[in-house]
Curated annotation (Swiss-Prot):
Coiled coil (residue ranges): none
Residues binding CoA, per UniProt: R191, G192, G193, R194, T311, N335, S523, R584
Keyword Magnesium carried by entry: yes
Annotated source species: Shewanella sediminis (strain HAW-EB3)
Name the record gives this protein: Acetyl-coenzyme A synthetase
Gene: acsA
Family to which this protein belongs: Belongs to the ATP-dependent AMP-binding enzyme family.
EC number: 6.2.1.1
């Protein structure tokens, strides 16, 4: 690894951060050698009703799979996010909210949030919700979404948040799986200037013939738009809150009692409900939030993720609020109505910590740095990236244009299933390399294995596994423990298989290469699609790229690249050939794209994830049965890509 690609921790940051390099190594070693002792100490960072005495009872044996942490202790997640701050921080701002329209703004103190949560917890009880019941939540990005989650946690109900971009069919499958009696929604949402018909989607979902469990639908008025109303079933949020008491004693929950369900997107067949429990999850979310973002009391923290994803759960609600942070919640998208919106919000709210996704960074890159000519950014101290591996070129742009080259970047790798960040730099402890998630968090033991499950040491590439449990880990697939074992523990026995491939360099840094099924086998050689994409995006005229394999008569698989050009760049055959030569120079002849299709847009979910299965089918000329496209932000993109595809049958 060349020294040019190494960004050293500055002495100022190392001196003022929670931990430096030496302390990280000491703590990490202790967490691996003596996990019980390590977590016995660090589990005390949250409040327990009945203190734990038993720390860890875990087995990755797929025939005897069980995960238990702090398992004889009791606590309440809502109390940890609210009640414990009231004595000295009741007037501290918990949530700053900015609507899709920047003129819509609210601030909510910890005292006010506590009152709202208690009221809604009592409202839920008035509608028959009891401990252990699953409550489906389909809300816009408003403070009330956090209120609902914390209210469920307060009374021991299990929330199942469904991303507001999901279709009625997706909602129905989740409601059926969880047998929800109560659904929480809003009349409409607002995102990027568009109205999202939330209540209408719920109505359509509940018309599904297999949905027979729902008794009540609680509806928040967000826009005041006209909605269908079912008497006896639908209830106004406001009428419940007007009469509810603001006193609600938090339910005493076991550490291993469920806190929430979150269904993984893109799962085939029945939805896969990832189940997280209370104690270990809260410890891990709070601890990773503090150390990875080097959070200091009084700072303003902005995670741009939607609450419908795990990032919104762990790093917009539970982790930051457990640590007493001031959290910025934004209803819209950070590049609407103009690409300058992100910078304007950072400056307006004096954001200290920003956590966003590579897809947004690339979208802003494509618009050009002149969009940030008026951006001050002096409040920013730490910046994070989440959701997919970040291309080195996007990392450098983020560092230069948003961070003004003075903010450490934490490129975090984790999953819905892991509950919290597993591999990431720590700002005061880790020299960074653009594109690398670097080193594991405390208690996390990553390894690389070959396809036979043999551990491979040193600088190498392989399948990324985790060798032992950590507190934030999911406990099961809801209602299907066999599926949990089959999906994560049978591929490589005795190890948690992440489904991702990775490289490890000579410094022990991890580089995530993408999903194992995002590997192209070209003439017997395995190529990670992320590597080819990074090379393409490094070209000055490329804003975004997605690479897939397609059937090739000679090579087995060929390389098919979908390329979105920067604003003002003209699509020419000369540029196409230039890009092929560019990739050949950057990686080698083997990685040269066979086909490069110009793409005005790529098929993405509203969280910004590229739906590669559509791209694979289009590249393979299998365009008659693409499957459900209802979760796409813009389904029309598919038709455009099909129309201009390059691999047509003769």
């Amino acid at each position: 690894m060349s020294t040019q690609s190494l960004y050293k921790v500055s002495s100022e940051i190392a001196e003022n951060a929670h931990i430096n390099e030496e302390q990280y190594k000491k703590m990490y070693q202790e967490s691996i050698v003596n996990p019980e002792g390590f977590w016995r100490e660090h589990g005390q960072r949250i409040d327990w009703i009945k203190p734990y005495t038993k720390i860890k009872k875990t087995s990755f044996d797929d025939h005897n799979l069980s995960i238990n942490w702090f398992y004889d202790g009791t606590l309440n997640a809502s109390a940890n996010c609210l009640d414990r701050h009231l004595e000295k921080d009741s007037d501290k701002v918990a949530i700053i909210w900015e609507g899709d329209d920047a003129k819509d703004q609210r601030t909510i103190t910890y005292g006010e949030l506590h009152s709202d949560v208690c009221k809604f917890a009592n409202a839920l009880r008035s509608q028959g919700v009891r401990r252990g019941d699953i409550v489906t939540v389909y809300m816009p990005m408003v403070p009330e979404a956090a209120v609902v989650m914390l209210a469920c946690a307060r009374i021991g109900a299990v929330h199942s948040v469904v991303f507001g971009g999901f279709s009625p069919d997706s909602i129905a499958s989740r409601v059926i799986d969880g047998k929800s009696k109560v659904i929480i929604t809003a009349d409409e949402g607002v995102r990027g200037g568009r109205i999202i018909p939330l209540k209408a989607n719920i109505d359509e979902a509940l018309s599904h013939p297999d949905v027979d469990c729902v008794e009540k639908v609680i509806v928040l008025e967000r826009t005041g738009g006209d909605v269908n109303w079912v008497e006896g079933r639908d209830i106004k949020w406001e009428s419940l809150m007007d009469t509810a008491s603001e006193h609600c004693i938090p339910e005493e929950m076991g550490a291993e009692d469920p806190l929430f369900l979150l269904y993984t997107s893109g799962s085939t067949g029945n939805p896969k409900g990832v189940l997280h429990t209370t104690g270990g999850y809260m410890v891990y979310a709070a601890m990773t939030h503090e150390y990875v973002f080097d959070y200091k009391d009084g700072e303003v923290y902005w995670c741009t993720a939607d609450v419908g994803w795990i990032t919104g759960h762990s790093y917009m609600v539970y982790g930051p609020l457990a640590n007493g942070a001031t959290v910025l919640i934004h209803e819209g998208v950070p590049n609407y109505p103009t690409p300058a919106r992100l910078g304007e919000m950072v400056d307006r709210h004096k954001v200290n910590i920003l956590y966003t996704a590579p897809t947004l960074i690339r979208a802003l890159m494509a618009e050009g740095k002149e969009q940030f000519a008026d951006f001050d950014g002096s409040s920013l101290r730490i910046m994070g990236s989440v959701g997919e591996p970040i291309n080195p070129e996007a990392w450098r742009w983020y560092n230069e244009v948003i961070g003004h080259e003075h903010c450490p970047i934490v490129d975090t790798w984790w999953q819905t299933e892991t509950g919290g960040i597993l591999i990431s730099p720590l700002p005061g402890a880790t020299d960074t390399k653009p594109g690398s998630a670097t080193r594991p968090f405390f208690g996390v033991q990553p390894a690389l294995v070959d396809n036979m499950g043999n551990i491979i040491d040193g600088a190498t590439e392989g399948n990324l596994v985790i060798l032992d449990s950590w507190p934030g880990q999911m406990r099961t697939v809801f209602g299907d423990h066999d599926r949990f074992a089959l999906t994560y523990f049978k591929t490589f026995r005795g190890m948690y298989f992440t489904g991702d491939g990775a490289k490890r360099d000579e410094d022990g840094y991890y580089w995530i290469t993408g999903r194992v099924d995002d590997v192209i086998n070209v003439s017997g050689h395995r190529l990670g699609t992320a590597e080819v994409e990074s090379a393409l995006v490094a070209h000055e005229h490329v804003a975004e790229a997605a690479v897939v394999g397609y059937p090739h008569d000679i090579k087995g698989q060929g390389i098919y690249a979908y390329v979105t050009l920067t604003k003002g760049t003209i699509e020419t055959e000369e540029l196409r050939q230039e890009l092929r030569k560019w990739v050949r120079k950057e990686i080698g002849a083997l990685a040269t794209p066979d086909l490069i299709q110009w793409a005005g847009g790529l098929p993405k979910t509203r969280s910004g994830k590229i739906m590669r299965r559509f791209l694979r089918k289009i590249a393979a000329n299998e365009v008659t049965n693409l499957g459900d496209s209802s979760t796409l932000a813009d389904p029309a993109v598919i038709d455009t890509l099909i129309e201009s595809r390059l691999n047509r049958s003769e």
